């Protein structure tokens, strides 16, 4: 699926710059959760379902990178995980998150170096963030940096940018240089009502 196939169905896919994305979320924020329900957006549920297969310890420290309004955090909480930090580019979306959902919330541009120490998280989940006009493949290096050895990273990549943005090469290279070991990799329904699929990847970090 290419950008021209989905941009009319999901308008934010037309955006190209970080500034445009932030402005769009400022307007869309109040309707975001409602639209996700109407669109049958299943990314958070699918990702947490896979994640919990490999992470039985519910006390681990997790980063929800690109947390939006907290949809992944809600799914994690439903499954017993409570030690969760959230980070997102949009202050508007962060302001909509229930105050008790995350331990810590930060406004962060994932395309830049993270102001975080290395090896501080047991796992990172990044859902709905690797998509048109949002976060680029090099952000994976920073996410891996903040994860402990043998920690997990679980992410989605919109299929429309998988090759166009170079995620196919990046994911393969991270395996080749032994930065991670990919455990699960498959195409998910993601936003089924819009005909938008995503690649879902779960990997163990190696250091």
Regions inferred by a protein language model and the residue ranges of each:
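Conserved alpha-helix/loop element of class I SAM-dependent methyltransferases that forms part
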Residues: 41-59
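A short glycine-rich, Lys/Arg-flanked "PGG" loop and its adjoining helix->strand segment in the class I
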Residues: 137-149
């Amino acid at each position: 699926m290419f950008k021209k196939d989905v941009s009319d169905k999901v308008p934010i896919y037309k955006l190209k710059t970080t500034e445009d994305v932030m402005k769009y979320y400022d307007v869309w924020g109040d309707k975001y959760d409602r639209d996700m329900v109407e669109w049958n957006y299943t990314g958070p549920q699918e990702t947490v379902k896979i994640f919990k297969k490999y992470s039985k310890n519910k006390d681990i420290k997790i980063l929800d990178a690109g947390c939006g309004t907290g949809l992944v955090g809600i799914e994690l909480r439903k499954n017993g995980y409570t030690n969760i930090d959230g980070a997102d580019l949009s202050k508007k979306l962060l302001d909509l998150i229930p105050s008790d959902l995350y331990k810590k919330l930060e406004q962060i541009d994932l395309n830049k170096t993270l102001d975080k120490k290395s090896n501080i998280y047991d796992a990172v989940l990044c859902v709905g963030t690797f998509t048109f006009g949002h976060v680029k493949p090099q952000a994976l290096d920073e996410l891996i940096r903040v994860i402990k050895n043998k920690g997990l990273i679980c992410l989605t990549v919109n299929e429309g940018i998988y090759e166009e943005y170079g995620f196919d090469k990046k994911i393969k290279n991270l395996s080749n240089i032994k930065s991670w070991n990919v455990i699960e990799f498959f195409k998910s329904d993601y936003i089924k009502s819009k005909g938008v699929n995503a690649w879902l990847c779960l990997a163990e970090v190696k250091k």
